[in-house]
């Protein structure tokens, strides 16, 4: 589904991605873990085309979308995204946020409004919130709205950027379970970046660890606890001492 080959990204003289190789199977939920500044968000932005890598190849659904420093347009691939913090539009009502894609593509107001209600119901929110603004909702409810927006286009792939950041443990667990359920319902492939190991263990089929711009470990969530990789051991146990500094 998603294949990344020898991907490099620099910012001035700093190498952020250093030859990343990654293959994500269709219909799976993959999670990339790693500390702050390890290149997780940069990798997602490169896949989305928000940043241009210096070198490497990116393919999605057997379609080559990036090679030789250039992106190739492909309108056949539908992508959903839940940004860190939700990234809702403060000036738009909740239904307008959820139906933003449909509104931008000229769908009529009645369709957009009703479709927003349907997608909000899928994440456990009722029609009482549709005319509110994001600032009138709690952080957990805003994340649900963002998830409703991400699934509204029935995407082939959904990217999640730190989906539980800023949430209390109960709200985080709700979001994790909604991610599992909704990704399965629409048959999407998902890729999540997080430093929250509880979330990673809950939603993943496979886990990758990114450190200093390189994938240094990969495996399923059942094997990560038994790995002897010192970087992984330090990270998943939150240890101050170890090779990560």
Spans of model-derived segments:
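Conserved ABC ATPase "signature" region
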Residues: 110-128
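ABC ATPase NBD coupling module
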Residues: 65-80, 104, 224-227
